[in-house]
Amino acid sequence: MALGILGRKVGMTQIFSPEGLAIPVTVVQAGPCTVTQIKTQATDGYNAIQLGYLPTAEKHLTRAQRGHLTKAGVTELLRHLREFRVDQPEAYQLGQKITVEMFSPGQLVDVAGTSIGRGFAGYQKRHHFGRGPMSHGSKNHRRPGSIGAGTTPGRVFPGMRMAGRLGGGRVTTRKLQLVQVDPERDLLVIKGCVPGVEGGLLEITPAKQVGNKR
């Protein structure tokens, strides 16, 4: 369990290695985040640190949210609050700033965000079903095929892959490598792609699993 950081996806680009290889990367504007609450085993039953991110206008926060930040002694209004489990919450203080300096180039991280919503999608797009014949009198072009038997069991089993809403859910991409860390501009350059749209909120944490899982 380790503390992470909040950020927003800027977009994708590419950089070149010393050998001249093009590396696709995602640029993330991460932090600075503010410690807004410290939870301990004695007070809350578990150890965690709550971070606030992205200064915003007062109209975007409820009275309860503003009171929570005031109680923590945080002067600026922060739009996003997220909690991270930690082993030693006593190592942090209310109002402390968390920046990208906690990471180093070459480190593996897990990135969580909300995937791009695709709306209502069919079987092929949502579940990668194969299509039916396109000619010779076939009318089964993009149909799903059988979804179960008849009288027995007389119902569609739960979990049957069918058409429905695609995307728009929480997704975590694991073990992505940090290519560059820029503390002056609060930027993380991550190899590969991360979930979500440009400007979407991301949670970046040190990788929980390093190596092959057995």
UniProtKB/Swiss-Prot annotation:
GO molecular function terms noted in the UniProt entry: rRNA binding; structural constituent of ribosome
Keyword Ribosomal protein appears in the UniProt entry: yes
Gene3D superfamilies in UniProt: 3.30.160.810, Translation factors (2.40.30.10)
Name of the encoding gene: rplC
Classification via HAMAP family: Ribosomal_uL3_B (MF_01325_B)
Alphabetical GO biological process terms: translation
PANTHER family named in the record: 50S RIBOSOMAL PROTEIN L3 (PTHR11229), LARGE RIBOSOMAL SUBUNIT PROTEIN UL3C (PTHR11229:SF16)
Top-level division of the source organism's lineage: Bacteria
Subunit structure: Part of the 50S ribosomal subunit. Forms a cluster with proteins L14 and L19.
UniProt cross-references to NCBIfam families, sorted A to Z: L3_bact (TIGR03625)
Region described as Disordered: 129-157
InterPro entries: Ribosomal_uL3, Ribosomal_uL3_bac/org-type, Ribosomal_uL3_CS, Transl_B-barrel_sf
Cellular component GO terms, alphabetical: cytosolic large ribosomal subunit
Transmembrane segments: none
Keywords for the protein's UniProt record, in alphabetical order: Ribonucleoprotein, Ribosomal protein, RNA-binding, rRNA-binding
Keyword Ribonucleoprotein: yes
Protein name in the entry: Large ribosomal subunit protein uL3
SUPFAM superfamilies listed in its UniProt record: Translation proteins
Family, per entry: Belongs to the universal ribosomal protein uL3 family.
One Pfam family hit: Ribosomal_L3
Function: One of the primary rRNA binding proteins, it binds directly near the 3'-end of the 23S rRNA, where it nucleates assembly of the 50S subunit.
